[in-house]
Amino acid sequence: IPGLTAALSGGAVLGAPLAHDFCVISLSDRLTPWEIIEKRLACAAMGDFCVAIYNPSSKGRPDYLQRAVRILLQNGKSEETVCGIVRNIGRERQQSEIITLRELENKQVDMFTTVYIGNKTTKNIESKMVTPRGYRTV
């Protein structure tokens, strides 16, 4: 949908992963030095933000998602954190999957993939990734 960011469109495919506070981080170091991206990932983990990740991998940087997962784990995210991936958001052959942060470390993704990392309250509810807002227990 024009004007709607991939983070929100892909989030709707997965369920409701980006409720409450969240951030969007690109892993592309073409315009942003990797050291700054590392700091953003660490701060997002320490703040227990839900995170949408753009540009998770490319031919020139095939291991950036794995590096990002390690940074998140080192800074407070649990291996059991609920995560999601959506490929080809809003296009033909759209695919989605809900996994854990531990499983994400070994996933092969590309530039057509948006990755979602939950927070401590994010759950897999009937194959939907849901981050409750805290008004009522789900």
Question: Model-derived features: where do they sit?
Answer:
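Class I SAM-dependent methyltransferase SAM-binding "motif I" and its flanking Rossmann-like core
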Residues: 1-47
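A contiguous loop/helix-start segment that scaffolds small-molecule binding in enzyme catalytic cores
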Residues: 46-138
